[in-house]
Amino acid sequence: CTVILGFFIARTITKPITDMRNQTVEMSRGNYTQRVKIYGNDEIGELALAFNNLSKRVQEAQANTESEKRRLDSVITHMSDGIIATDRRGRIRIVNDMALKMLGMAKEDIIGYYMLSVLSLEDEFKLEEIQENNDSFLLDLNEEEGLIARVNFSTIVQETGFVTGYIAVLHDVTEQQQVERERREFVANVSHELRTPLTSMNSYIEALEEGAWKDEELAPQFLSVTREETERMIRLVNDLLQLSKMDNESDQINKEIIDFNMFINKIINRHEMSAKDTTFIRDIPKKTIFTEFDPDKMTQVFDNVITNAMKYSRGDKRVEFHVKQNPLYNRMTIRIKDNGIGIPINKVDKIFDRFYRVDKARTRKMGGTGLGLAISKEIVEAHNGRIWANSVEGQGTSIFITLPCEVIEDGDWDE
């Protein structure tokens, strides 16, 4: 009888409690799949049922937590901003790929290190100050690549107010800062370029007002200079208006099918007639090359390049024209070469920048606005082309222009 009673107690009380203890151990290890066997409908059975319900809810909660964690990890990984998260002591625990790319560092070189140290801010900030200061600021993150980021700090705070960590959001503003810098430079250049002729005109007009108009020799000279400066201002304003239209994409391009051989020869002939002191050498294929572009816009490009070549050639002035076509890619390359003074190698790539002049005094004296090549570049690129320069000091400069084209063989029009 005693044995039977002991077996009954073991089955109805001890065994369920042992099962629940074992399941508790499994739950502590992260295993929520097992369930406690229910041996009866008494209090122990109800406890086992409640335990199973608890285990199920914990399993569901854990699954939801894991799902949210994966979703959050995916969001952080694919964010366009850099994200750095730390513990309450400021040691980095989470960093996404964009932050690593911005910093130019590997994950193992960051995890566990102090955030302020990684961002080179340990001398400027303390963790406590991040809590109090919500202002963003600019930071040079990668000097080698010239990367600038706007950094925003925030804190991770529990309901009790206890700070458990910090987050830094890094937003790449390199391009934005460059655009802003170029805008400021552009405004400064425009102001300078307008002020120079206005100052000159004002001086001559004041001299005329003070009686120089009575001088039959000086008066015509002063009026001539005033007229030249006025014309230069008109050219500058027109160039600025054209650039503004291009920037706003409101400048219409009216493309036509053009016989390029005839087109370029006509332009060369016109310059050849007006420049008797310059020799024009042509290396243009006899096969007809057809292209599609706005003839007025491209005439402006070639006029500008040829005029520059004539201006800067020296001695026995010579301007060469070489046209080559690549039928494999349906592209043609036009090379216009002068025998001028050339351009220093460190300045060649800058000649297409707005208002850039290799020799400012000389260019201004020759009537240039400093915008011609910048406009030419905009026009060529709008035609799916490319323009660049190659130069050797003392030997001259070559301007290259590539454009889409097609070579038409004899008889193609009859098919």
UniProtKB/Swiss-Prot annotation:
The gene is walK. Overexpression of walK/walR reduces susceptibility against vancomycin. GO terms for biological process: cellular response to phosphate starvation. Residues 189-407 form the Histidine kinase domain. Autophosphorylated. Its EC number is 2.7.13.3. Pfam families: HAMP, HATPase_c, HisKA, PAS_9. This is Sensor protein kinase WalK. Forms homodimers. Forms homooligomers. It is an enzyme of class 2 (transferase). PROSITE patterns: HAMP (PS50885), HIS_KIN (PS50109), PAC (PS50113), PAS (PS50112). InterPro entries: 2-comp_sensor_kinase, HAMP_dom, HATPase_C_sf, His_kinase_dom, HisK_dim/P_dom, HisK_dim/P_sf, PAS, PAS-assoc_C. Residues 68-138 form the PAS domain.
